[in-house]
Amino acid sequence: DDLSRGLGDVYKRQELWGSGTPGPTGEVSSFLASKNVVAAGADTWSYDVVPPIDLNEPYPGHQILLKENGIYILEAMSTGELAKDNVYEFLFVLGQAKVRGAVQMIINPIAIN
């Protein structure tokens, strides 16, 4: 289950919600930006490590991806079934509501294998 490191059953255990989360480092976010990705995401409630590794530079993924490169961040992705089925390649379809000025949006992504 190497692809799934996030929420799992935390939704069912509310005492763990917001208690901390793993995530990629700024170095990983810089690598993704160098590859000109459109979006990056995780199965955690925050893309970045929480609590931050460096309190002087919290949430480096948000700074590098969103602010500096305009790359979308997808959080709380449900990847457990993909990991369980060893699916590494799929068509990713993402529709979003058109809301002017929004900085966050509830989305309904689909992975088609």
Model-derived regions: residue spans:
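Single conserved hydrophobic/aromatic residue that forms the stacking wall/gate
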Residues: 1-7, 11
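Generic beta-strand/beta-sheet core signal
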Residues: 4-5, 42, 76, 93-95, ...
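Solvent-exposed loop/turn segments at secondary-structure junctions
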Residues: 8-9, 46-48, 99
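Extracytoplasmic/secreted cell-surface and envelope-processing proteins
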Residues: 12, 49-51, 102
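Active-site-proximal segments of metal-dependent phosphoesterases and phosphodiesterases across multiple
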Residues: 12-26
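Extended C-terminal subregions enriched in glycine
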Residues: 22-56, 63-83
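Short low-complexity, flexible loop/linker segments enriched in glycine and/or proline
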Residues: 55-58, 90
